């Protein structure tokens, strides 16, 4: 039994372990599957990205291949033309052997002059660089001064803003203190108003009593002494310019004391009927005088309101004081009236006790609790309204301050954006000016080369052309279009004496000047053929100039389109110079061989040579300019081939 139980337990344990391993294996497989799915999605995204990149590269490569095919076609065409020009040039070399040495000497002298001019232009270029560095330093100093001034103004602005905020907080404190004082004065005015209502009830009772006493005939004729007392009481006037705010509490206490002492005096001193009548007469005269007295106080009230309005406007919160009833002058009048009435009441101490008790009871029970509650609610509503007005004013001031700050920030941002736009526009204009200068210098160089080639007819300027190309490439490597323009202008000016020398050399090899030729008819026929061939030569010259201009414009566009290509100009120039030197050496060797062969043939058969010259006189005279044009086209083709090779190499890069 024990073994069976153990085996069952072990079996259950094994089953649970197996189940757990299966579950964990399933979970691990699910996690591995999810991880592989995520990696697969990432790999698909990367593959899609690389596929798009490959498509873009293939499109770019297709464009490059198309450009390469066009360049190869143009190169093949130029090679054919170059081959044809070389054949013509070899024929031309035999005839131009004598003029070659002279052309070399002229080209050497020209090269020395151009070299001197090049050194001068280099010195000018260094001076311009120094001036540029000085201007950059001055610009940097001005920028530092501007930043310093801007920081100073910013600090000053922040300081002024802090000072204004402090002043504003102080003004708010003063406004709060003035409001507290106004609230206290309103409270005091409310107390005095309640006392005034009590006194009004007493005055009404006094009038009733006076009417009853006037009906009695014994009280209608007072004694002269009593009239003097009445006039004496009538002669007491209220004090003018009495300050309520300073003596308000003292008057209230005095009024309380007089009001409390009035019943006691009535009980202690019974007055005669004449004194009562005199008191009532004094009250009547007081009521007649009292309407005149507020006129003087009204002026003081208006003056005081104007002063308070000015104080409120300085704080930034001008309030309409007409809406807020300020009762300080009225309180003054009422206090004075109460005092007069109390003085008159002292004369009426002899009236019956029942009337006095009735009047005091009416005075004490005049204001009901409902009226007091309404008055308290009115005061609370007024205080809430004032607090709400103060909060609204503070919120308006805060919003105004925030609006001002936002406006200042917007103005500052607009100023900075305007400065950035002006700077960008200036940079853009400067770049356009530089590009126009480079383009103008390039076009001037092309025109000068074309004019110089047209003037130098009959001179194979192989070495001189190589020197000019070297100098031109050096100027382009230096990247100074102004120097390149000045470099070609003296060359154009110096072309006139060289052209005259070339014409003299061409006239030397003219068959008309040859002593062996004696046929004048042949010379006339040659002149006629030359005149007929002039239009054809002009057309060919125009075509060659247009072709040369197109090649140079393509080169300029390629150089301007890719700024990285401009950095490789110097290395390519050195390579091209080396290749040209090798080609020049080969051509010089061929020239020597041809000269040697020509001398041998001339020494063996001089008559045949003369005959050949006579036979070739007409075509030589007819095509001297054509050969020169072929020579110039050969140079242009060499330049175009070099440019095509450069562009092809850059396209491959």
Swiss-Prot record:
InterPro entries: GOLIM4. Residues 123-143, 261-270, 290-307, 319-328, 348-360, 381-398, 466-505, 527-545, 588-599 have a biased composition (Basic and acidic residues). It is a single-pass type II membrane protein; Lipid-anchor. The modification Phosphoserine is found at residues 328, 538. One of its GO terms (cellular component) is Golgi cisterna membrane. PANTHER family: GOLGI INTEGRAL MEMBRANE PROTEIN 4. Residues 34-653 are lumenal. A lipid is attached at residue 2 (N-myristoyl glycine). It comes from Rattus norvegicus. Residues 565-587, 631-640 have a biased composition (Acidic residues). Residues 399-423 have a biased composition (Low complexity). The modification Phosphotyrosine is found at residues 574, 631. Residues 66-216 form a coiled coil. The modification Phosphothreonine is found at residue 587. It is found in: Golgi apparatus, Golgi stack membrane; Endosome membrane; Membrane. The chain crosses the membrane at residues 13-33. Phosphorylated by c-AMP-dependent kinases most probably in its lumenal part. O-glycosylated; modified by sialic acid residues. It comes from the Eukaryota. Keywords: Coiled coil, Endosome, Glycoprotein, Golgi apparatus, Lipoprotein, Membrane, Myristate, Phosphoprotein, Signal-anchor, Transmembrane, Transmembrane helix, Transport. This is Golgi integral membrane protein 4.
């Amino acid at each position: 039994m024990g073994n069976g139980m153990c085996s069952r337990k072990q079996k259950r344990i094994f089953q649970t372990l197996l189940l757990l391993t299966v579950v964990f294996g399933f979970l691990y497989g699910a996690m591995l599957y999810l991880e592989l799915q995520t990696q697969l999605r990432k790999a698909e995204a990367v593959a899609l990205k690389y596929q798009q990149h490959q498509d873009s590269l293939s499109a770019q490569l297709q464009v490059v291949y198309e450009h390469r095919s066009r360049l190869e076609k143009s190169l093949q065409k130029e090679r054919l033309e170059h081959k044809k020009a070389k054949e013509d040039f070899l024929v031309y070399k035999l005839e131009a052997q004598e003029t070659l040495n002279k052309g070399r000497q002229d080209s050497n002298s020209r090269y020395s002059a151009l070299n001197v001019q090049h050194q001068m232009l280099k010195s000018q270029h260094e001076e311009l660089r120094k001036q540029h560095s000085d201007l950059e330093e001055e610009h940097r100093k001005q920028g530092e001064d501007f930043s310093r001034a801007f920081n100073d103004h910013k600090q000053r602005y922040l300081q002024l803003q802090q000072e204004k905020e402090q002043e504003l907080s102080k003004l708010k404190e003063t406004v709060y203190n003035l409001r507290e004082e106004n609230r206290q004065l309103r409270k005091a005015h409310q107390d005095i108003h309640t006392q005034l209502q009590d006194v009004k009830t007493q005055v009404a009772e006094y009038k009733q009593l006076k009417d009853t006493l006037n009906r009695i005939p014994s009280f209608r004729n007072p004694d002269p002494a009593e009239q003097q007392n009445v006039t004496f009481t009538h002669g007491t006037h209220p004090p003018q310019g009495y300050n309520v705010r300073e003596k308000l509490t003292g008057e209230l206490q005095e009024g309380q004391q007089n009001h409390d002492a009035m019943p006691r005096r009535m009980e202690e001193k019974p007055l005669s009927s004449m004194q009562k009548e005199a008191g009532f007469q004094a009250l009547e005269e007081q009521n007649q005088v009292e309407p005149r007295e507020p006129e003087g106080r009204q002026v003081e009230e208006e003056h005081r309101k104007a002063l308070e309005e000015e104080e409120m406007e300085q704080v930034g919160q001008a309030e309409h004081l007409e809406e807020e009833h300020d009762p300080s002058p009225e309180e003054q009048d009422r206090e004075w009236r109460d005092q007069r009435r109390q003085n008159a009441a002292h004369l009426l101490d002899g009236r019956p006790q029942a009337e006095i008790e009735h009047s005091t009871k009416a005075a004490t029970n005049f204001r009901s609790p409902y009226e007091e509650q309404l008055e308290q609610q009115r005061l609370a509503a007024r205080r809430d309204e004032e607090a709400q007005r103060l909060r609204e004013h503070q919120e308006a001031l805060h919003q105004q301050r925030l609006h001002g700050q936002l406006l200042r920030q917007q103005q500052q941002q607009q100023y900075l954006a305007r400065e950035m736009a002006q700077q960008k526009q200036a940079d853009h204009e400067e770049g356009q000016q530089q590009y126009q200068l480079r383009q103008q210098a390039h076009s001037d160089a092309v025109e000068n080369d074309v004019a110089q080639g047209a003037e130098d007819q009959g001179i194979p300027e192989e070495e001189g052309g190589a020197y000019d190309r070297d100098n031109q490439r050096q100027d382009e490597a230096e990247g100074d279009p102004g120097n390149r323009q000045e470099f070609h202008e003296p060359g154009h000016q110096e072309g006139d004496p060289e052209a005259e020398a070339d014409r003299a050399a061409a006239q030397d090899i003219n068959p008309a000047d040859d002593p062996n030729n004696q046929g004048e008819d042949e010379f006339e026929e040659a002149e006629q053929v030359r005149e007929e061939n002039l239009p054809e030569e002009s057309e060919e010259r125009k075509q060659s100039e247009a072709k040369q201009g197109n090649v140079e414009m393509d080169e300029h566009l390629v150089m301007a389109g890719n700024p990285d290509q401009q950095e490789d100009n110097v290395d390519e120039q050195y390579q091209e110079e080396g290749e040209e030197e090798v080609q020049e050496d080969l051509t010089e060797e061929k020239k020597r061989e041809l000269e040697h062969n020509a001398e041998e043939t001339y020494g063996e058969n001089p008559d045949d040579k003369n005959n050949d010259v006579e036979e070739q006189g007409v075509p030589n005279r007819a095509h001297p300019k054509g050969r020169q044009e072929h020579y110039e086209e050969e140079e242009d083709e060499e330049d175009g081939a070099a440019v095509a090779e450069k562009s092809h190499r850059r396209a491959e890069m």
